[in-house]
């Protein structure tokens, strides 16, 4: 490019000069007329050449050249000559390289395109390494002096040339390369066509002759491509689809757009009468068959007679050929563009290539002749292709898709569907069958024949089914096809169609999630297509026998019974109107999904549950569970084009495979009357197991309170690949709230409920203002239900469900009762057993017993596990490992709790509910006695991690134990990658592996969330707490070995100190927000905040009054001792659950129960020996392992359980480590909140054992890390934060610099220079804490902390100082009481002046009564010096501090 540009400049200037030189020879007018004439060229050719060159140069350069020319015109001849001689020659300078690098010119693209076309060809058996291809292209460009395209641009051109090519990574581990699969170098290379440089031909003939010669030389591909372009353009201009240039020409002639008397027009018309009809009927895509090439040339063809005739001949020939052979796979795109299948049938397959490939389905597409003649070539289903005109006609689409039994078809097969053109009004129906290709792993296997009949237009479909098999959902949704492209309006013909789709695991969705149901392409915007479908499901004799039993065979995808839903047109009661607003169209095609089906789904959720009988009572209004959430065929569809309906499939319905994207559900579709309320509400006693591996606690979907069925629509935003379809996985859980009420009642009350999806928030609008507006309880339940960790949703999206009172209108939020539901595609389902017991559920519906049953949420479908993991196996592991682990429940519950916390981006954008849309909101259930403390963190750091740090944590007092704020439970495991920004779901265990992303989850863990990860997981990430599962015999906590422990303390203590310092020092929120802090964790920090909430049964914790985190933790510790006795491996080494875990201390003698502390992740409290909370003193904490554990607990957010393992550690050892003083955090939350939140996390334990002591849920591998990481948004950085900081809390205080030995080998010193002693270890830490802390301190003007840090660092550097001055006598290590009595000098460096560290910030804090109280109560609230005011407090710790 640069060269061309310069050459042009030179050329033009040179030509200028030459023109002047020629002036003598030429007539005086010549130079003026052709200033840029090149000698030897005729005027026309010179102009042509100049014009060509000019077009290849960007505008800016053209303007520059013009300016230069203006200057040059003023020169004398000599000056011009001089300029000409001075023009630089040779390769152009790099001056313009920057401009070129920014954007590739069309010339470069053309070169690349031609090189690719001439060098490579498709070959299914071979692959070419991408780098080699690019290198070859680059060398080609270098040889010719072209500027090569950037690798990214080149890749785009490759995709254009070979749309079917896929990228693959081939090679052995560590040596794999990315390859273009399906390509090879051409075996036979054609001589490249060279541009015609012969400009000496006579100018007169230039027009006609040149075009014809160009056409003759142009290769057929180019011609067909040009035809396609012309047709495409004509379609836009004329709003009429044209299959070929012939059609266009004929149309132009018939419509009198052009003269009909010309030779060309006559020829066209003669050809038309001669038998072109057959041609037109050839596939709609015929010209498109070669669609892959793009060439803008030949635009003028239509106007050229010769061109037209030639094209006619060629096209006719081609069309006839193509009649014989169905279009090649590559042609799909073309088809799409051209006209989409005339019947629209092919369109099923035809959306975009992406759509095509993903779901293989054996489909027989029968185009049923629609009663109304459809105009020929009118695509009934308009694919998103540009063709669709804006007309909003709805064509009746009568398509019967019959899936062949057990045929698995590769995704590409759809491409092979011959288009059945309806042709000119003679609807010729072909019944091409897509032949199944060999099943591939992708291939969808349809267990039982699925028949999807799509009928369009208000259709009342009745599917009487005497028995309900496993639900076969017939999705009766009218698909309004807006064949926008054709101007002709077609009457809507309603066809009744019923489809019983075998749902492989998810009813209608075929395993791949491609629902047989055709996705009606979203009508084009501007096409008002609203077809209402009234579907009545009349459970005909749905006998309980026929209870929908979703058997989930280990291969959940494989066995699914088929339930036929009988739909009767009952009145509007069930009618689902799916309206597609144009706007909505994109979001959702017909949304009317039988939400009732969803309701049943709620029941059905369990369906995937093994062997769970969802008995639909025989006569219940039996809206049997219509799982009418057909998956849209195109999982990939990037836009929510597909009918929301199809998308709506119950999340559970969704294929289990986490990979699949649930089709987006119509977000706006009102939920059809709740009639779908689970017909056979499961009797309360009837367990509707979550469908999750948790067999143990199937939750009964019994409706607990309200008649109203609550539909929880939980959209989970799943971004998979590029498609960010908000797959709203709505699991509409219709929970019949009145257990005894008949479903009808439920239906009646909920019928009018509209679920509106605004932004990410669903608003439930009770239109009917039914007698029972959904009670908040019901809503809470819904929220619980709604919280489906949809494994499919990779991106956890918080969806705030707003309960809008019907009367108040959608905008009225009845209450923030809704916990915003966080959907993390959490595999939690597997874990989550409904914690019926768990207080969380209670929390969720405190007053309302209502749904412990959110259980359904854990639907196998949500399992991120692939089918090979069976629920059974998972269940067994889970049950065996920790059936009681509340953890399982926690994740779900937190969802119930609306633990939106995790979601940073609350889906609540559109909804009034989220007060802080930016931050996940945690709404405590209104009923919970605990007052939720909603502290939005200033801003959840938007990190790739799915779980935004929940900014608000609910800190609950003792009640929190019972109700545990969801936060505690929330520690939901986030997808493993979340910290990395990948929301990809990993096997249930993995996402929650407690290891920070840096620590590879143990192989076991992947399968078993509770599995133990190797204790040796990386030490550097203390956050990576590997021991996620109960201790296994082989993994005795290293801490149990006294000598080893001591050594490790000595060796590692400092290394962990830095992180601990981070954790012990709350990382300032600004830091917390830093990616560096967050990223190390694979899991969102939200869990951490939970950790920080240690559950305190203690009364003082129960009160919301600020509780010193230390005391808090002490109580936690006490609780921990209470906690389940089964031994939990103490997080060894740096593995403490605290993500800052580097400072985790091993407790040698701590009982397993103590170790069980859940890695702090759950409790974040080291269950240290029970230490009287009051006894805990900051110094005591430093000194006593118990205290340290307390600190750890306090820091659970920071996940720096410094003391965690330290209980058994001798005081001397502990004393040797300096506890970095906590840095002041500008947390908005009160410490109390933080602590409470931590307590709540403890509550997970409660869930587990139903006792506060049950930390197991936290303890589970996933929980450990996830809680630590996820618990507190503050902690989200996985930065170790002060325990207090862990939850973002308003309180600020400096933690005393504790002398504790942290496992991490680093010293606590924050100053970058000062950790030198242990500086080497720092490298392991997630952050170089010294610099980070320093920045934090500076940034937050925490000079005091900084000073403290410096002092601490200096002290740490001089470890000897600590050992001599601060070391406690080993005698003291025995009990905290002793510690309380210790001489303060032992704990603190006597040399240090109490006032030294105090700073303006401290003074501010001192002025804050709450802060003071907190400081008083929390050991770590103050540095030894620094809070003199605390001396007035009666705590011995305070005294010691003083």
Swiss-Prot record:
Record's keyword terms, sorted: DNA-binding, Nucleus
Biological process terms in GO annotation: positive regulation of transcription by RNA polymerase II; regulation of transcription by RNA polymerase II
Null mutant phenotype: Morpholino-mediated knockdown in embryos results in a defect of ciliogenesis in the neural tube and failure of neural tube closure. At stage 18 (late neurula), neural folds fail to close. At stage 23 (early tailbud), lack of acetylated alpha-tubulin and ARL13B positive cilia. Reduced expression of TTC25 in cilia axonemes.
PROSITE patterns, alphabetized: RFX_DBD
Pro residues bias spans: 935-947
Biased composition (Polar residues): 957-995
Function in brief: Transcription factor. Acts as a transcriptional activator by binding to promoter regions of target genes. Plays a role in natural killer (NK) cell maintenance and immunity. Plays a role in the process of ciliogenesis in the neural tube and neural tube closure by regulating the expression of RFX4.
Ranges spanned by the short sequence motif PxLPxI/L motif, renumbered to the chain: 192-197
UniProt superkingdom: Eukaryota
Main location: nucleus
UniProt similarity note: Belongs to the RFX family.
Subcellular location: Nucleus
InterPro entries: DNA-bd_RFX (IPR003150), RFX-like (IPR039779), WH-like_DNA-bd_sf (IPR036388), WH_DNA-bd_sf (IPR036390)
Name recorded for this polypeptide: DNA-binding protein RFX7
A GO molecular function held by the record: RNA polymerase II cis-regulatory region sequence-specific DNA binding
Transport among keywords: no
One Gene Ontology term, aspect cellular component: nucleus
Region called Disordered, residue ranges: 1-36, 406-426, 485-514, 929-1001
DNA-binding stretch(es), residue numbering of this chain: 112-187
């Amino acid at each position: 490019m640069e060269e061309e540009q310069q050459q042009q400049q030179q050329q033009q200037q040179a030509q200028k000069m030459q023109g002047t030189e020629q002036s003598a020879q030429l007539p005086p007018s010549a130079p003026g007329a052709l200033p840029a004439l090149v000698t030897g060229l005729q005027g026309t050719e010179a102009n042509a050449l100049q014009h060509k060159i000019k077009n290849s140069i960007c505008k800016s350069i053209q303007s520059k050249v013009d300016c230069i020319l203006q200057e040059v015109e003023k020169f004398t001849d000599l000056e011009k000559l001089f300029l000409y001689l001075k023009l630089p020659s040779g390769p152009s300078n790099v001056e313009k390289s920057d401009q070129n690098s920014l954007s590739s010119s069309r010339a470069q693209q053309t070169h690349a395109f031609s090189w690719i076309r001439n060098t490579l060809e498709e070959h299914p058996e071979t692959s070419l390494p991408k780098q080699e291809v690019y290198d070859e292209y680059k060398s080609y460009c270098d040889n010719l002096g072209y500027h090569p395209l950037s690798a990214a641009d080149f890749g785009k051109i490759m995709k254009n040339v070979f749309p079917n090519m896929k990228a693959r990574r081939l090679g052995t581990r560590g040596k794999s390369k990315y390859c273009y699969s399906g390509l090879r170098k051409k075996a036979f290379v054609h001589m490249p066509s060279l541009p015609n440089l012969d400009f000496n031909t006579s100018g007169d003939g230039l027009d006609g002759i040149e075009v014809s010669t160009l056409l003759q030389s142009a290769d057929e591909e180019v011609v067909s491509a040009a035809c396609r372009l012309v047709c495409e353009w004509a379609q836009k201009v004329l709003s009429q689809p044209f299959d070929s240039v012939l059609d266009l020409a004929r149309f132009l002639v018939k419509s009198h757009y052009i003269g009909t008397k010309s030779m060309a027009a006559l020829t066209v018309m003669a050809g038309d009468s001669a038998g072109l009809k057959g041609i037109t009927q050839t596939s709609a895509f015929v010209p498109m068959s070669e669609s892959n090439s793009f060439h803008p040339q030949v635009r003028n063809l239509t106007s050229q007679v010769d061109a037209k005739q030639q094209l006619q001949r060629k096209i006719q020939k081609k069309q006839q050929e193509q009649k014989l052979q169905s279009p090649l796979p590559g042609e799909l795109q073309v088809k799409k563009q051209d006209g989409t299948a005339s019947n629209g049938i092919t369109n099923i397959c035809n959306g975009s290539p992406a759509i095509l490939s993903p779901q293989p389905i054996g489909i027989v597409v029968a185009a049923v002749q629609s009663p109304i003649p459809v105009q020929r070539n009118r695509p009934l289903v308009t694919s998103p292709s540009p063709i669709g005109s804006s007309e909003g006609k709805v064509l009746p689409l009568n398509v019967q898709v019959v899936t062949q039994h057990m045929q698995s078809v590769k995704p590409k097969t759809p491409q092979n569907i011959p288009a059945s053109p309806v042709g000119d009004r003679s609807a010729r129906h072909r019944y091409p069958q897509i032949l199944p290709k060999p099943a591939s792993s992708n291939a969808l296997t349809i267990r039982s024949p699925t028949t999807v009949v799509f009928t369009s237009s208000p259709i009342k479909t009745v599917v009487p089914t005497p028995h309900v098999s496993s639900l076969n959902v017939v999705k009766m949704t009218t698909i309004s096809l807006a064949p926008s492209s054709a101007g002709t309006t077609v009457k809507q013909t309603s066809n009744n169609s019923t489809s019983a789709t075998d749902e492989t695991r998810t009813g209608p969705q075929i395993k791949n999630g491609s629902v047989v149901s055709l996705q009606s392409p979203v009508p084009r915007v501007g096409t008002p297509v609203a077809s209402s479908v009234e579907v009545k499901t009349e459970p005909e004799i749905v006998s309980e026998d026929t209870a929908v039993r979703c058997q989930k065979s280990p291969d959940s995808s494989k066995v699914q019974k088929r339930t036929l839903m009988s739909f009767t047109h009952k009145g509007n009661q069930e009618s689902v109107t799916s309206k597609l607003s144009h706007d909505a169209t994109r979001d959702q095609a017909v949304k009317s999904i039988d939400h009732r089906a969803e309701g049943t789904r709620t029941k059905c959720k369990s369906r995937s549950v093994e062997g769970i009988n969802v008995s639909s009572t025989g006569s219940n209004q039996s809206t049997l569970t219509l799982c009418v959430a057909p998956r849209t065929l195109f999982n990939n569809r990037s836009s929510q084009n597909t009918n929301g309906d199809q998308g709506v499939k119950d999340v559970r319905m969704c294929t289990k495979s986490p990979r699949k994207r649930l089709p987006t559900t119509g977000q706006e579709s009102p939920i059809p009357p709740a009639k779908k309320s689970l017909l056979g509400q499961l009797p309360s006693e009837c367990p509707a197991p979550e469908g999750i591996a948790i067999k143990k606690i199937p939750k009964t979907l019994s409706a607990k309170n309200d008649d109203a069925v609550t539909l929880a629509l939980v959209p989970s935003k799943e971004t998979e690949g590029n498609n960010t379809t908000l797959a709203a996985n709505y699991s509409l859980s219709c929970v019949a709230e009145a257990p005894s009420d008949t479903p009808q009642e439920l239906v009646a009350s909920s019928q009018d409920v509209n679920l509106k999806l605004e932004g990410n928030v669903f608003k439930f609008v009770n239109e009917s203002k039914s007698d029972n507006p959904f009670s908040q309880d019901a809503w809470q339940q819904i929220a619980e239900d709604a919280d489906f960790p949809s494994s499919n949703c990779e991106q956890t999206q918080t969806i705030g469900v707003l309960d809008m009172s019907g009367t108040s209108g959608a905008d009225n939020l009845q209450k923030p009762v809704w916990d915003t539901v966080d959907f993390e595609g959490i595999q939690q389902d597997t874990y989550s057993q409904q914690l019926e017991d768990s207080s969380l559920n209670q929390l969720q519906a405190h007053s309302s017993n209502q749904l412990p049953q959110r259980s359904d949420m854990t639907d196998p479908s949500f399992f991120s596990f692939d089918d090979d993991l069976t629920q059974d196996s998972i269940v067994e592991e889970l049950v065996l490992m920790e059936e009681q682990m509340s953890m399982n429940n926690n994740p779900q519950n937190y969802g119930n709790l609306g633990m939106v916390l995790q979601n940073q981006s609350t889906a609540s954008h559109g909804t009034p509910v989220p007060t802080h849309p930016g931050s996940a909101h945690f709404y405590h259930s209104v009923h919970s006695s605990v007052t939720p403390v909603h502290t939005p963190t200033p801003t959840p750091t938007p990190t790739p991690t799915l779980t935004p740090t929940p900014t608000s944590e609910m800190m609950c007092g003792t009640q929190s134990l019972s109700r545990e704020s969801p936060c505690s439970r929330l520690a939901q495991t986030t997808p493993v990658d979340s910290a990395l920004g990948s929301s990809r779901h990993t096997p249930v265990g993995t996402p929650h592996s407690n290891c920070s992303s840096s620590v590879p989850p143990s192989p076991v863990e992947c399968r078993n969330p509770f599995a133990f990860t190797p204790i040796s997981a990386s030490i550097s990430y203390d956050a990576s707490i590997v021991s996620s599962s109960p201790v296994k015999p082989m993994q005795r906590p290293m801490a149990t070995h006294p000598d080893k422990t001591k050594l490790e303390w000595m060796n590692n203590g400092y290394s962990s100190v830095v992180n601990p310092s981070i954790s012990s020092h709350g990382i300032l929120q600004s830091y917390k927000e830093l990616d560096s802090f967050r990223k190390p964790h694979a899991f969102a920090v939200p869990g951490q905040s939970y950790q920080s909430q240690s559950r305190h049964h203690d009364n003082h914790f129960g009160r919301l009054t600020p509780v010193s985190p230390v005391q808090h933790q002490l109580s936690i510790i006490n609780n921990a001792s209470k906690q389940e006795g089964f031994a939990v491996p103490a997080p060894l080494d740096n593995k403490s659950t605290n993500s800052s875990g580097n400072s985790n201390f091993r407790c040698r003698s701590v009982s397993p129960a103590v170790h069980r502390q859940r890695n702090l992740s759950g409790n974040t409290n080291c269950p240290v020996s029970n230490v009287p909370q009051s006894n805990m003193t900051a110094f005591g904490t430093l000194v006593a392992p118990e205290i340290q554990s307390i600190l750890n607990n306090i820091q659970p957010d920071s996940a720096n359980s410094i003391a965690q393992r330290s209980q058994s550690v001798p005081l001397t050892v502990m004393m040797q480590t300096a506890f970095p003083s906590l840095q002041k955090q500008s947390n908005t939350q009160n410490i109390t909140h933080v602590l409470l939140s931590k307590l709540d996390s403890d509550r997970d334990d409660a869930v587990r054992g139903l006792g506060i002591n049950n930390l197991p849920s936290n303890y589970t591998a996933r929980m450990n890390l996830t809680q630590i990481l996820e618990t507190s948004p503050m902690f989200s950085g996985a930065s170790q934060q002060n325990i207090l900081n862990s939850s973002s809390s308003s309180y600020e205080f400096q933690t005393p610099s504790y002398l504790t030995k942290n496992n991490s080998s680093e010293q606590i010193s924050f100053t970058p220079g000062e950790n030198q002693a242990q500086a080497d270890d720092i490298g392991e830490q997630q952050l170089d804490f010294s610099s980070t802390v320093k920045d934090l301190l500076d940034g937050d003007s925490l000079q005091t902390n900084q000073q403290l840090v410096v002092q601490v660092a200096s002290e740490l550097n001089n470890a000897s100082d600590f050992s001599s001055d601060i070391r406690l006598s080993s005698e003291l290590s025995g009990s905290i009481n002793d510690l309380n009595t210790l001489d303060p000098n032992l704990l603190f460096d006597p040399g240090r002046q109490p006032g030294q560290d105090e700073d303006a910030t401290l003074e501010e804090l001192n002025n804050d009564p709450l802060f003071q109280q907190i400081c008083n109560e929390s050991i770590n609230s103050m540095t030894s010096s620094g809070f003199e005011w605390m001396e007035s407090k009666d705590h011995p710790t305070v005294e010691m501090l003083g």
